[in-house]
Swiss-Prot record:
The lineage of its organism: Eukaryota, Metazoa, Chordata, Craniata, Vertebrata. Changing residue 620 to C: In a breast cancer sample; somatic mutation. Widely expressed with highest levels in pancreas and testis and lowest levels in lung. It is linked to Congenital disorder of glycosylation 2BB: A multisystem disorder caused by a defect in glycoprotein biosynthesis and characterized by under-glycosylated serum glycoproteins. Congenital disorders of glycosylation result in a wide variety of clinical features, such as defects in the nervous system development, psychomotor retardation, dysmorphic features, hypotonia, coagulation disorders, and immunodeficiency. The broad spectrum of features reflects the critical role of N-glycoproteins during embryonic development, differentiation, and maintenance of cell functions. It comes from the Eukaryota. GO terms for biological process: endoplasmic reticulum to Golgi vesicle-mediated transport; glycosylation; Golgi organization; intra-Golgi vesicle-mediated transport; intracellular protein transport; protein glycosylation; protein localization to organelle; protein stabilization. Residues 504-543 are annotated as: Disordered. It is a peripheral membrane protein. Changing residue 37 to H: In CDG2BB; uncertain significance. InterPro entries: COG3_C, COG3_N, COG_su3. This is Conserved oligomeric Golgi complex subunit 3. Component of the conserved oligomeric Golgi complex which is composed of eight different subunits and is required for normal Golgi morphology and localization. Interacts with TMEM115. Keywords: Acetylation, Congenital disorder of glycosylation, Golgi apparatus, Membrane, Phosphoprotein, Protein transport, Transport. Pfam families: COG3_C, COG3_N.
């Protein structure tokens, strides 16, 4: 109780301070929180209502009972009191305060402190019980820890004893292992010595076998003995520090030489025996070409298994031991010598027979000769593979040597061929049929043959280029046209009539072929496309074909040029083709210009111009499919500066400057300024064709314009001269009063021009249709002519309005522009 009283002292002091502070709120007259009268009345009403505050209605009776049972040390009966006052009375009774009354705040705080102390004591009871319970467990754990420490001490003692025993046992085990290791090393040393001595001990065994008279390279024990000999040599060679190393190595080498000699003798004798047997079949040593090759290959293939196993062993060892490589080379040489001895005469005989059979047909000769050599090369490679497994370059050398015999026969024939068709066909055979079709598909076996074919192809191409130069000079540049070649437009009219008659017959008999299905010079035209249209991408149907478009109707130099280029295109290199094409096209253009002049002299100027335009169009269209540049570069030396410098140094005024020791020395100036210049010129044949075509079209347009409106242009030129004189101070004029410009004469002039157009225009259009036979081309070519005529008439109309009165204009009666347009109308 004394402790409780001590605890209540500070609490009572705190309550007193609180009450004093609360009193300050209400103190008069200095109030800390003054209230209004209304607020004061409200507080009094609340105080009166709070004096008899009941237990909250929402608090269940069960909770109240539970709270009471936990907080108060009294036993509640199962019967719930009927009123709250009974419950409170029992609570105060349990605290010994049933006689006390709480009327002031101090009494309430005292009661509350007492109640709280009682509750704290009740609450601490269970913790004290738990503390006592846990203390018991702690004592038990301390006892267990003591037992564990005792067990650990016993285990530590046991571990020390175990380590002592283990160390003793390990020492014994290591001693045993060391003894076993020494025993194993001694055994290995003995085996190693025995293994090394075995290579030396094999010498006597191998030497005995090699000296045996019954030893054969085909026996079962020869190959194993050979392998053992190789192993011994390899081993001894790799240990030069052994005792008696040079002696044993020399002895083993001698054994190897004996074995190699036996193998070489057997193989060489086998091959030579085969050759001698085959040669004995023909006393003249030149086997019959019909059955010789069959015997050559059958006999050798039958004998191949006898030596193939032995040769395989040699090839396997050739990379490691030089003696085997030398033996393999000797066997290769022997084999190839025997094959050359057999094949050389037979190939020469066969080539001679082919030459005699195809003496006049060079293409057939080249085809048959190349096919024969292809079979020979393939058969030789297959036969070689029957004997050997590794390739050798000596086989290709032999085949190249055999192919030279074919080349030696063909070359004299090639260099005497003069026809471009034959030479181009030979190029096609060698390049396409032989190199591309055969050699590329089997390059390994035909490599040697390809070298000879390439040399032959180069000779043919060289001959083709040479003959092409001559052909261009003789048949194009030097071509002398026959009268029939220049019979234009007569031949076109005749062919048109023939075509029309055939077309009429076709209408009568539909089953017969029309003229459009007839191809002239079919053999040559297969390599060329039909031409004549300015737009090759839009060819005309064959039913509207022009006679000038037929291959046979082309001017001979054009036909020859295009045929020549078509044959050269796939036969020679692009650079060479560019040079030849430029030369051929230039010569062809010059021949066309000459033919055009001749036709213009013999017939009319329009025929010559249209002839030139038509054939230039053909040239431009036909060279378009050649996917190459028709450009060549020419290099020239310009000596103009050298000449000027030489003249300058020869001038007497410069002689004193020869000996000057400065930059004004004449000799130094000559060396610096007189250096010749190298100039490069590019010649483009396609642009040359286009340039001449443009020039021909411009000449045609100018000539036709002059034909139709020349008099009007002369009249307007006079008027312009008259105006110029007047503007420069000359006498004034009245154009209608000039003798040559009177309305009646101007009327005659306009009527004559209109009549000329009306009468000669159909002739011009007819000629264009006959030569060009293409509405698009005709429209494009005639359009500038029509525009020029219209421009002249427009200027003429403007001149009439400016210089003549309306009455004079009516007298002149110049055709209107609408009339002129209708007259010049050409449907596209």
């Amino acid at each position: 109780m004394a402790e409780a009283a001590l605890l209540l002292l500070p609490e009572a002091a705190a309550e007193r301070d609180a009450r004093e502070k609360l009193a300050l709120w209400d103190r008069r007259p200095d109030t800390t929180a003054p209230l209004t009268d209304r607020q004061t009345d409200s507080v009094l009403e609340l105080k009166a209502a709070a004096e008899n505050l009941p237990v909250p209605a929402e608090l269940p009776i069960e909770d109240l009972c539970s709270l009471t049972s936990q907080s108060l040390p009294i036993e509640l009966t199962s019967v719930v009191p009927e009123s709250t006052e009974d419950i409170l009375l029992k609570g105060f009774t349990s605290l010994g305060m049933e006689e006390e009354r709480i009327e002031t705040a101090q009494q309430f705080f005292s009661w509350f402190a007492k109640l709280q102390t009682q509750m704290d004591q009740d609450e601490g009871t269970k913790y004290r019980q738990m503390r006592d319970y846990l203390s018991g467990f702690q004592e038990q754990c301390d006892a267990i820890l003591n037992d564990v420490n005792s067990a650990l001490q016993h285990l530590e003692s046991l571990q020390k004893q175990y380590l002592f025993v283990s160390n003793k046992t390990g020492t014994l085990h290591e001693a045993c292992e060391q003894l076993l290791k020494e025993q194993s090393e001694l055994v290995d040393l003995a085996e190693n010595i025995q293994q090394k001595l075995s290579y030396f001990n094999e010498l006597e065994t191998i030497n005995t076998k090699l000296n045996s008279p019954t030893l054969s390279v085909n026996s079962d024990g020869f190959i194993p003995m050979l392998a053992k000999l190789d192993d011994c040599i390899t081993y001894i060679s790799s240990h030069p520090n052994f005792k008696d190393y040079p002696i044993y190595l020399l002895k083993f080498k001698q054994c190897l030489s004996k074995a190699l000699h036996l193998m070489k003798t057997y193989t060489v004798n086998t091959l030579q025996t085969l050759t001698s047997q085959l040669l004995k079949r023909d006393p003249s040593s030149v086997p019959n070409a019909d059955n010789a090759f069959t015997l050559f290959y059958v006999k050798f293939r039958a004998a191949a298994p006898k030596v193939r196993t032995l040769i395989e062993q040699i090839e396997l060892r050739s990379e490691k031991i030089p003696e085997y490589q030398q033996l393999l080379n000797d066997i290769h040489q022997c084999y190839l010598d025997q094959r050359e001895l057999l094949l050389g005469p037979s190939i020469a005989c066969t080539v001679a027979e082919l030459t005699s059979q195809n003496n006049r047909d060079h293409c057939a000769l080249v085809r048959s000769g190349c096919a024969f050599m292809v079979h020979v090369c393939q058969d030789e490679h297959q036969l070689y593979n029957e004997f050997f497994t590794k390739p050798t370059s000596k086989l290709d050398e032999l085949l190249e040597k055999l192919c030279v015999s074919l080349y030696d026969v063909f070359r004299p024939l090639i260099i005497h061929v003069i026809h471009l068709e034959t030479l181009s066909e030979l190029c096609g055979i060698l390049k396409n049929e032989v190199l591309e079709d055969h050699v590329q598909n089997n390059a390994e076996q035909l490599g040697a043959f390809a070298a000879g074919v390439k040399q032959m192809l180069e000779d043919v191409q060289e001959r083709l280029v040479y003959r092409t130069h001559i052909y261009i000079q003789t048949d194009i540049t030097g071509y002398k046209p026959a009268p029939g070649d220049l019979a234009y437009p007569d031949k076109l009219v005749m062919m048109e009539q023939i075509a029309q008659s055939l077309k009429d017959e076709q209408k009568k008999v539909p089953s017969e072929a029309s003229f459009s299905d007839v191809h002239l010079e079919e053999g040559e035209s297969n390599s060329l496309t039909k031409s004549g249209s300015t737009e090759s991408l839009n060819p005309r149907p064959q039913t509207t074909i022009s006679p000038a478009d037929l291959h046979g109707m082309w001017y001979p130099t054009v036909r020859r040029t295009l045929v020549c280029l078509s044959k050269l295109y796939r036969c020679i290199d692009r650079a060479v083709f560019q040079g030849l094409s430029q030369e051929a096209l230039s010569a062809c253009i010059q021949s066309l210009l000459g033919a055009s002049e001749s036709i213009s002299k013999n017939k009319t100027q329009i025929d010559g111009q249209l002839f030139l335009i038509k054939h230039l169009l053909i040239l431009r269209e036909q060279i378009a499919p050649f996917h190459t540049e028709f450009t060549i570069k020419e290099i020239s030396l310009d000596l103009k500066k050298t000449r000027d410098a030489a003249f300058k140094i020869l001038n007497p005024m410069t002689v004193p400057r020869f000996f000057r020791l400065n930059s004004n020395n004449a000799l130094i100036e000559f060396l610096l300024e007189g250096t010749p210049e190298i100039r490069e010129h590019y010649l483009d044949s396609k642009k040359d064709v286009d340039r001449h075509l443009k020039s021909a079209c411009e000449q045609f347009i100018q000539q036709q314009t002059k034909l139709f409106v020349e008099q009007l242009e002369e009249f307007m030129t006079k008027v312009s001269a008259l105006k110029t004189m007047a503007s420069q101070g000359g006498p004034k004029y009245t154009l209608s009063q000039q003798p040559w410009a009177q309305p009646a004469k101007v009327n005659d002039l306009a009527a004559t021009a209109y009549k000329t157009i009306k009468t000669k225009l159909p002739v011009t259009l007819r000629s264009m249709s006959l030569y060009l036979s293409n509405k698009d081309t005709e429209f494009i070519l005639f359009k500038p002519v029509r525009n020029n005529i219209q421009q002249v008439f427009q200027k003429f109309h403007a001149l009439l309005k400016e210089e003549f009165s309306p009455e004079d204009i009516q007298i002149i009666a110049c055709p209107s522009m609408e009339q002129l347009s209708l007259l010049l109308l050409v449907s596209k």
